[in-house]
Each structure stands twice: as structure tokens, then as C-alpha cells.
Amino acid sequence: MRMDKSEKRSNLADNFLYMLEFMVDDLLITRPNLCAPEEYPTCTEITFRSVFLNIRDRENGSCVNPCSPKCGKCTLFTLESPITDEDVMHIHVYKKRTESCKFLLGLTELPMKPIFDRVKKEFYSQNINWESNVESHLSRMPKLRGPCKKANDCVCYERNRERREQWCPTSELTKRMLPLFNLCKMQTGNIVLILRLVCNGPSVVSSFPVQRPVCKDPCNCCCPCPPTWPAPCSSPFDPCDPCKTVPAKKT
């Protein structure tokens, strides 16, 4: 069976890494759950496929401070299958003490396919021919085994065929006010959710500093001598060997 170009592209794009950022900007409950204790924290649970987040308005035993900064969360995930019209984000608002003791205040859904389609389309427009770039790099890369004839044409020096460590990520920031409903289909309030979806491509690359280890034994120092010798200030110790004293000159 012959695979066309569109199917081949979708298979490569299945390995994309996505990041979702959430923040509850505002929450208004007009029809409260009378069974829910007011002192319990208000928790917003967000579920989308394998993603699950729990955003609380405060910690247990503390009061809500309107002047405190709002708390948001982010998650990094992949898609095990392409997005369809049936993929929705489930949002539940609870008065929750523990996982086994929580009271539903309202729930709602948010379709996710339009957001994913726009972010993915922008990724392809920002990273033109990234798939052929990866395939060309893998096929022309010098290898220890097998013929390396394709690696002799210096194609790696052409900028249009440069393979990057990480492709240009694309994102979309949206702010939605969604109605909340109870299990009787009655509206109980509204929630304002700020959501940001980031498409990172097939990989994420970042650098990090590594500090050189400090020798524990000063008499067996593994660090090299300082570049300036003799030292600016006269010292009775040898900087390369702290256990050895430097004989003082007689004047």
C-alpha cells in the first residue's frame, strides 16, 4: 500500500510536544451548592486526555486573599492519536477537602480541535519544510556502517538545509468565559479561563550550566594553579599546594 505525502506528514507530527498553560482569572457562582461547606477550598479540575490539573484558590486552613497573585499551572504532553471533533476539555469546579470529600459547584466543556488546528497550522508556516529537512539530515548523515557516498557533497553547509536543534515554537493565547452547569442542566455560574497552547515540535532543547566540583581535600587539590603567579599579596602558602609553605626571603 502506497503512503501519500499527507499521511506521511501526520505520522511525523504525531510526535509533537505540546504545552498547556492554565489560569483561572475569575469565578462567579450564582447558584451555590448548599451542601458544600464554605470553608473548603474551591478547586478547578481540568481534564484533557492524559492531562489532569488541579488549581486551588487557597491552601487548607487559609483565607482567600484578593491581593495575592493568581496561581496558574502548565503541563507538557504528547498526543497518542490525532485530535478529533470529539476531543473536549472537561472543567469541573468543586468545593474540595480531599479527593474523597468534594462537592460539585459546576462543570463545563471546551472544544479543543480548533485551537490545536490553528497552532499546528502556524507551526508549519513558521517552520517551512521541516519534515524534509529532518529526513534529508538523517539520510545524508555520515554513519559508521553502510555507504557514506551521500555525505560527500557538503550539503550540510547550505543554510536552507540546516537542521536546527529545536524548531520555532508557536502558541495561541485565549481567554474564555464559560458557563457552569450542575447535573440538572441548570446554570450555576461562570468561569473565566486563560489558556495558552504551545506547539514545540518533535523535541525541546535547553542548556544548563554545570558547576565544577570543589575539592574537599585542600592538600590534594585537583584544581590548576591560578594564572597569576606570584600572588598580588605576599602569602606564606603556595596557592598550588596549600600544605606547602613558601620560604620567606631574607632582606
UniProtKB/Swiss-Prot annotation:
Q: Where are the transmembrane segments?
A: none
Keyword hit for Transcription: yes
What domain of life? Answer: Eukaryota
Cellular component per GO, a single term: nucleus
Q: What happens when the gene is disrupted?
A: No loss of viability or obvious developmental defects. Reduced levels of apoptotic cell receptor crq/croquemort in macrophages during embryogenesis stages 11 to 14. No effect on macrophage development or distribution, but reduced ability to engulf and clear apoptotic cells during embryogenesis.
What is this protein's expression induced by? Up-regulated in response to detection of apoptotic cells.
Q: Which GO terms describe its molecular function?
A: DNA-binding transcription factor binding; transcription coactivator activity
Sorted alphabetically, which keywords does the UniProt record give? Apoptosis, Nucleus, Transcription, Transcription regulation
Q: Name one GO biological process term.
A: apoptotic process
Compartments where found: Nucleus
Name the job this protein performs.
Answer: Transcriptional cofactor involved in efferocytosis. Together with srp mediates expression of the phagocytic receptor crq/croquemort in response to apoptotic cells, and is up-regulated by crq/croquemort in a positive feedback mechanism. Involved in macrophage engulfment and clearance of apoptotic cells during embryogenesis.
Subunit structure, briefly? Interacts with srp (via GATA-type Zn-finger domain); this interaction enhances srp binding to the promoter of crq/croquemort.
Identification of the protein by name: Transcriptional cofactor Bfc
Q: What is the lineage of its organism?
A: Eukaryota, Metazoa, Ecdysozoa, Arthropoda, Hexapoda
